[in-house]
């Protein structure tokens, strides 16, 4: 687990998230891509969580979910593709690329879940393309009401490999008491 810190996947300090929320920690799973041993560990976690779901196609959420959905699709020999943040304004003008999802049971894959907005938009895009979303899978749920927001807005259950508090417990020996306490206190402010 120390490798997550060493590779810069998990950082502590002051960060502004894509949602505009300020946070004392940042998790960037894209950084794992430069470390094959970490990719193997991340993919193993995703595979374990996916074993609970029956699906036909995997779709990564742009951009963090794309590499992992691709690897998972390849390993499981399932069709895969990705969901753009918005439909292209040219060519086919599609939001869902890669596999044709019409009539298929899809799992939407992302790296980190905060508010749930990216997943909500991706689920809506898959449905508009004729797919049935049977679940959403993230590596890390930051426990900031994202899974509840997704369920409330779309009816789709979010599965995660890790919850942030679990990850913090595991990382505690490597991050120091100050960072650990700041992160736990920050998470305690979120009531869903």
From Swiss-Prot:
GO molecular function, one term: magnesium ion binding
Residues bound to orotate: 114, 142
SUPFAM superfamilies in the record: PRTase-like
Its EC number(s): 2.4.2.10
GO biological process: 'de novo' UMP biosynthetic process; pyrimidine nucleobase biosynthetic process
Subunit structure: Homodimer.
The protein's name in its UniProt record: Orotate phosphoribosyltransferase
